Every structure is written in structure tokens, then in C-alpha cells.
Amino acid sequence: MSLHVTLRFTVALAAGLLFGFGLALSEMINPIRVLSFLNVASGHWNPSLLFVLGSALAVAFPGMALQRRLKRPLLDECFHLPSKKVIDRRIVFGSAIFGTGWGLTGLCPGPAIASLSTGLGPVLLFVAAMAAGMIIHDRIVVRCLS
């Protein structure tokens, strides 16, 4: 394995470990914590997860500024940036479905996968159903649009 490939795997491993640890430490893997953050209207809103958002922005903004100055990333051939900038029906509908699921369960993909470490049955079922939903999307929606 080349040094370049080893570095890419090492960076991916370190980023994944940091992300998973941060999800657990911030309690993003706790659906009750997430639902209390999303529960703005009840008078029992818990804004603590705003620190997660703030930390992401504190890293992303300088990273985006650096990206604009670089010709290519250090460990890849090019930057993989979204090219679609139009908000269409698919984005709106998909966002509504995602938001409904997140609001009902308090879990979204990253925290759900990190929650697998708990070994809890409902989390295992949620992740399996989430994967099934993605497979159904790929088999039906992507094929219809192709």
C-alpha cells in the first residue's frame, strides 16, 4: 500500500474516531437530548446542542476559505463539492421526509450509526430500516430518474 493511500486511510480513521467520540460526548446519540433540542415550542427547550452546530461552523468556515485558495486537496485529486445549487422538489420533499424522521425519533444517520455501539435493539432496527430506505430509494427513485 502506498504512503498516499495509507495517509488517506489514517486521516479517515482519525476523523471517524473523532466524530464518533464527539457524537457520544455531546450526547447527539441520545434521542431524548436531540428531541429536547428540537422541542422549541414547549417551554422545555434545551439549546445545548447549539454548541455542536457552533463547533461545526468554527471548523467549516476556515476550511472553506482554505479550500478556495488551494488548487486541490492534500490527499485527493480534486475537491468533491456539490454542483447542484437549485432547490427543487426532490430536495424539498426529501428534506421534509428526513426532518419528519428526525423529529419523530431524535436520530439521524451519523448519530444512529454511532449509537450502534450501545447495542440497543431499537437502534439496530432503526439503522437496518434506514439502510433499507436508502436501498429502496436507489432501486426505485434513482432508476426512474436515470
Swiss-Prot record:
Domain of life: Bacteria
Cited Pfam families: DUF6691
A single Gene Ontology CC term: plasma membrane
Induction field: Repressed by BigR.
Transmembrane segments: 9-29, 46-66, 91-111, 116-136
Cysteine disulfide partners in this protein: none
Localisation per UniProt entry: Cell inner membrane
Membrane topology: Multi-pass membrane protein
Entry keywords, A to Z: Cell inner membrane, Cell membrane, Membrane, Transmembrane, Transmembrane helix, Transport
Keyword match Cell membrane: yes
Keyword Membrane: yes
InterPro entries: DUF6691 (IPR046513)
Family: Belongs to the TsuA/YedE (TC 9.B.102) family.
Remaining remarks: Part of an operon that comprises bigR, blh, XF_0764 and XF_0766.
Protein name in the entry: Probable transporter XF_0765
Organism, as annotated: Xylella fastidiosa (strain 9a5c)
